[in-house]
Amino acid sequence: MSSPLDHLKTQLQRAMVAAYGETLSGADPLLVNASHPKFGDYQSNAPLPLAKQLNQPPRTIASTIVDHLEVGEAWEPPTIAGPGFINFTLKTSYLASQLELRLTDPRLGISAVKLPLRVVVDFSSPNIAKEMHVGHLRSTIIGDCLARILEFLGHEVLRLNHVGDWGTQFGMLITYLREVCPEALTAPDAVDLGDLVAFYRQAKQRFDSDPDFQAIARQEVVRLQSGEPDSLHAWQLLCAQSRREFEKIYNLLDIKLTERGESFYNPLLPQVIQALDQTGLLVEDQGAKCVFLEGYTNKAGDPQPLIVQKSDGGYIYATTDLAALRYRIEQDQADWIIYVTDAGQSTHFAQVFQVAQRAGWIPNRIRLVHVPFGLVQGEDGKKLKTRSGDTVRLQDLLDEAIDRARNDLVSRLEAEGRQETPEFIDHVAQVVGIGAVKYADLSQNRTSNYVFSYDKMLSLQGNTAPYLIYAYVRVQGISRKGQIDLEQLTEQPTLSLQEEEEKLLARHLLQLEDVLAQVTEDLLPNRLCQYLFELSQKFNQFYDRCPILQAEEPLRNSRLGLAQLTARTLKLGLSLLGIQVLERM
């Protein structure tokens, strides 16, 4: 369905050109949500920045634009407020008619895009032979959320897991395991991932301190790269062991990924060097092959190179990322490539993108985006660690969230005198615990660090997953109490929006499409979280102040329709965040 906001934006742009000529063609009408409900639903701030350009007072500009504006049947006549804001209010009759259409639409009025794009979302990307830790949490959750939203809007999304499954560390680990635990290289499940991580640390210490061991490990890398059967088999076993552990976490988080690790691109690395050489970008510096970057200098002020092949012939991360980028453009035919990693890699990706751009690999149609995020911090404001100072294992973090959610639920059941089955308790604990962790992350602006707090994220009060899930549960409670299937109301409600709480809820229900469009533009999932939080607040105000089951017909059916739309919107919105809902909790 056409968004009333899109229509208004188009009409405003036409009015600005009609009032002041083609100089304002393409000018942004600066439409935003009204600062307060008393000012209406939206306001245009455009007259204020135009005052200097047009040499007129903002209120005069606002009045002139309004004189040329045809808002259409959806809107009340616009008003001018303050220094020159233009305020717009949707007609109550229009609100009701639009919501009635959404009652029978499984997509809640949100159209799929007319021109779907092929989108690659690169996220999660743990390292083989290492456990997933809290540092992988944000990439995994943010990347999955963006992929879900893009898929829902009709784009063709390839979710890629660029795992670290190649490099010197495997020569080091295989060499060490041959000495201390050879069965790990010949039999599956001979050691668990925790043991493998410990062996990896020991191998690294040996590699750093023992030149003879280091030389053997480097020879092992050569054997692996040349495809020696025993080395290749050992590597495959290590990868399979890690993969099984990763899958446990992905299943718990309900994450779907296509694994395409660094090893996939290994055969393509010589082609990257050759292609860069053919473009004239490649420079040899102290035996290494590199590309000197524009806009980057070292401390001495000299141009900074991006090394793509070391003097010993080895490759680095940048080479692999260039090969991956080229493959995604040429073979995957991607229109849009999104990399979801921590902010510390921003410079790396800016440099990789620059080299690919200068090499002529990126057609104009391609949109390349790095989606950076901040750190997960402990209550002390420092990087989240265990009490012993180790990195927090992601499995431990998720297990504790579920355990705490279970304890909270059991305490509440005891206080209420309720009896529930162990299966019910386990299911609710998992949905609430996992949902709380996801929502606590996604509700923050991803560019900021955030403090990880189980107490805050599991609270039934405030901007949390339990609060939103409980709002959904309240609607299901209406259904049970009234013995009504809200999904199958006996007659199509004619919505009657009389009370202010009904109107505020109705207006908010119509905004989801605009919110998803904004998230698609700036890739900030917290916008969707804020929308759902405000929806829950508005529903709770409506629920507390407007009788539903006790109301007389046709008002009763109208309010049941509003409750049904709220539940469906919450369920859809939470599913786009990767969070399940509950019928009871």
UniProtKB/Swiss-Prot annotation:
Keywords from the named record: Aminoacyl-tRNA synthetase, ATP-binding, Cytoplasm, Ligase, Nucleotide-binding, Protein biosynthesis
One example of a Gene Ontology biological process annotation: arginyl-tRNA aminoacylation
Catalytic activity reported: tRNA(Arg) + L-arginine + ATP = L-arginyl-tRNA(Arg) + AMP + diphosphate
Cysteine disulfide partners in this protein: none
SMART domains tied to this protein: Arg_tRNA_synt_N, DALR_1
PROSITE patterns hit by this protein: AA_TRNA_LIGASE_I
EC number, UniProt record: 6.1.1.19
Ranges spanned by the short sequence motif 'HIGH' region, renumbered to the chain: 126-136
One GO cellular component term noted in the UniProt record for this chain: cytoplasm
Principal EC category: ligase
Source taxon at top rank: Bacteria
Gene3D superfamilies assigned to the protein according to its UniProt record, in alphabetical order: Arginyl tRNA synthetase N-terminal domain, HUPs, Isoleucyl-tRNA Synthetase, Domain 1
GO MF terms, alphabetically ordered: arginine-tRNA ligase activity; ATP binding
Family per record: Belongs to the class-I aminoacyl-tRNA synthetase family.
HAMAP family referenced in this protein's UniProt entry, alphabetically: Arg_tRNA_synth (MF_00123)
Protein's UniProt name: Arginine--tRNA ligase
Gene giving rise to this polypeptide: argS
